[in-house]
């Protein structure tokens, strides 16, 4: 499904449950367009609901370039599991420059929709704790180009390392198959 139709389908599914503060997961390989899709969804839901959905980026949860699995577990332990128990979620953003989680504690108690975007957000465990899941894909060459363009090529050396973690994670969790909606973003 193309991005425009996918966006409409996502809104059709999420809008009726928006008052129930749904948890929406947006996953896909690096460079597939998850962040732009999530920001557009957040803005459109804000326009419709007159309340801003919370947006969490997995980039704030990974403990560095080797941390895709750890970031996925951090999402579960510190955000999704507490919210599933009607508790406040507390977490520290990972500081990629300081290479630590020390810093300001962030919290979220629910009450508005939550959108989590990023590689590893959609696992077997996280799917059980969410209300709607979206998988976004794009051809590998396009994803690689987007990855390089996003930060001016300064992180190109990490592409293969990250991609191999994605291979392992997605073959284990079969994230695309867990989604309610699959979008091809060429």
Show which residues each predicted segment covers.
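Conserved lysine of the Walker
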Residues: 34
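Hydrophobic positions on the alpha1 helix immediately C-terminal to the Walker A/P-loop
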Residues: 37
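Conserved nucleotide-sensing/catalytic segment adjacent to the nucleotide-binding pocket
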Residues: 54-56, 60-108, 113-114
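ATP-dependent NMP and nucleoside kinases share a basic, alpha-helical "lid"
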Residues: 100-149
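Small-molecule kinase domains that catalyze NTP-dependent phosphoryl transfer to phosphate-bearing small molecules
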Residues: 152-186
């Amino acid at each position: 499904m193309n991005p425009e139709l996918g966006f409409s389908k996502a809104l059709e599914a999420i809008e009726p449950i928006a008052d129930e503060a749904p948890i929406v997961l947006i996953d896909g390989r690096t460079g597939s367009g998850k962040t732009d899709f999530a920001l557009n969804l957040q803005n459109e839901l804000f326009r419709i609901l007159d309340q801003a959905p919370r947006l969490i980026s997995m980039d704030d949860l990974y403990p560095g370039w080797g941390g895709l699995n750890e970031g996925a577990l951090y999402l579960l332990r510190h955000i999704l599991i507490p919210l599933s128990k009607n508790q406040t979620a507390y977490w520290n953003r990972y500081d990629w420059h300081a290479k630590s989680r020390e810093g300001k504690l962030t919290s979220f108690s629910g009450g508005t929709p939550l959108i989590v975007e990023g590689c590893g957000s959609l696992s077997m465990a996280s799917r059980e704790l969410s209300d709607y899941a979206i998988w976004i894909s794009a051809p590998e060459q396009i994803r690689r180009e987007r990855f390089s363009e996003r930060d001016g090529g300064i992180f190109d050396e990490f592409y293969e390392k990250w991609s191999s973690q994605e291979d392992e994670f997605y073959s284990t969790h079969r994230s695309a198959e867990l989604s309610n909606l699959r979008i091809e973003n060429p």
